[in-house]
Amino acid sequence: MHSKPSRLPFSLALRLTFFISLSTILAFIAFTWFMLHSVEKHFAEQDVSDLQQISTTLSRILQSPADPDEKKVSKIKESIASYRNVALLLLNPRGEVLYSSAQGAALRPAVNSADFSEHSRARDVFLWTVEDTARAMDTGSGMKMETYRIIASSGQATFQGKQQNYVMLTGLSINFHLHYLDALKKNLIAIAVVISLLIVLIIRIAVRQGHLPLRNVSNAIKNITSENLDARLEPTRVPIELEQLVISFNHMIGKIEDVFTRQANFSADIAHEIRTPITNLVTQTEIALSQDRTQKELEDVLYSSLEEYNRMTKMVSDMLFLAQADNNQLIPDRVRFDLQSQNSLKVFRVFSEALGPKETPILLLKFNGMPCLVEGDPQMFRRAINNLLSNALRYTPEGQAITVSIREQESFFDLVIENPGKPIPEEHLSRLFDRFYRVDPSRQRKGEGSGIGLAIVKSIVEAHHGRVQVESDVHSTRFILSVPRLEKMIPDTQCWE
């Protein structure tokens, strides 16, 4: 069954362009809407003000008792003429027309609307749209719609020689305003489309230019290969947003370079370590075959070859052990035990007895007898301590003592193995636990050490969530093996076998 390939995420440049453009366009749309709304509101306020002023003026003219009808009509026409697109309709209570301007008939249907009485009592302004039949006939085009703002008022006036009630509808055509708003809206939409395209283009260019340092960093990273792992990026030459990325990348490259260097040295060292016993075996065999040998001589050659085979076997076993540690396959059997129990002390006593009383240094144990509870694999701990003691023995001058002590820390027990001898230069201390690393620049093997004993110690300690470190001064060298401590005695506590 074939799995569907996952869709690649959008590029960072596309995302930035989209979101910035969208934000800018939405802001422009909001500004356009606000401007249209402001213009429309201004027109409405202006129309209402004009209608209220016209209605007040006309009511004053109608309610003047001294003026005859003709004079009132004349004043009404003069008042209307001073405004543009004003329609007036004057009705008596029976609905008969007392006076109508040229466009007054368009207001007649508004009287029959359901909300007219309410608008009339409140004297508020309302909208009314009618079909402009006259204008459609004049222009010969389709039916036109005329929209008015209307204010209705009522009162009593002397008209046609008698006092009578009237209803006055004053309307102001707003088609001019509506046409202006419609044209403004279309123009703004066209401008918005053009500006939006320009915004997207400008932002795209700006984002691409802004990503130039990122592309430069990417190109610089592409140029780093296994042949120039010493190359580093300059954090001071990139924007502050990329500074931490460059620092982290340099740190990663430093680790990779260190791994490559160690791998190269490891390959050379293991080749040297294996070549030496193989060369010895070949040489011994060639010498043995160069002439007739007695049985005793042949046995000596075989015993010598067996020693070389054992040394190679131990080296291969150690390398397999380290390979397990590298692949996180080194899983210790965890049991609880006391570092200072009698069975635990046997590890050191057996080693001390094996040293002999004269020609080797003395092993001193400085334990306080208090419980030192830890959890781990006793066999692995034995191997780590044996490696440290063997290393201390190798570099301790004749007749001087190796000291083993335990120090209590807040959450660790420190097992300290200290031996006198020449101080180790500080620049070598951090590399002592590397495989086949030697303080001697010639990197030649001396004695019986394989060069990976301390590396095994480090792997064992780290598998137990501990740490190992080394200190050196003019008096002595101290290897400190720190193991997590248990807080209290556990009933099933075991000891080293």
From Swiss-Prot:
Listed InterPro entries: CusS-like_sensor, CztS_silS_copS, HAMP_dom, HATPase_C_sf, His_kinase_dom, HisK_dim/P_dom, HisK_dim/P_sf, Sig_transdc_His_kin-like_C
Catalysis: reaction(s): ATP + protein L-histidine = ADP + protein N-phospho-L-histidine
UniProt keyword annotation of Cell membrane present: yes
Positions of transmembrane segments: 16-36, 187-207
Residues recorded with modification Phosphohistidine: 272
Principal place of residence: membrane
Topological region Periplasmic: 37-186
HAMP domain mapped to chain residues: 208-261
GO cellular component, one term: plasma membrane
Residues exposed to the Cytoplasmic side: 1-15, 208-497
Residue intervals of the Histidine kinase domain: 269-487
GO molecular function: ATP binding; phosphorelay sensor kinase activity
EC number: 2.7.13.3
Parts forming coiled coils: none
Bilayer disposition of the protein: Multi-pass membrane protein
CDD domains per record: HAMP, HisKA
This protein's record includes keyword Ubl conjugation: no
Keywords on record: ATP-binding, Cell inner membrane, Cell membrane, Kinase, Membrane, Nucleotide-binding, Phosphoprotein, Plasmid, Transferase, Transmembrane, Transmembrane helix, Two-component regulatory system
Subcellular location: Cell inner membrane
UniProt function note: Component of the sil cation-efflux system that confers resistance to silver. Probable member of a two-component regulatory system SilS/SilR. May activate SilR by phosphorylation.
Stated name of the protein: Probable sensor kinase SilS
Organism: Salmonella typhimurium
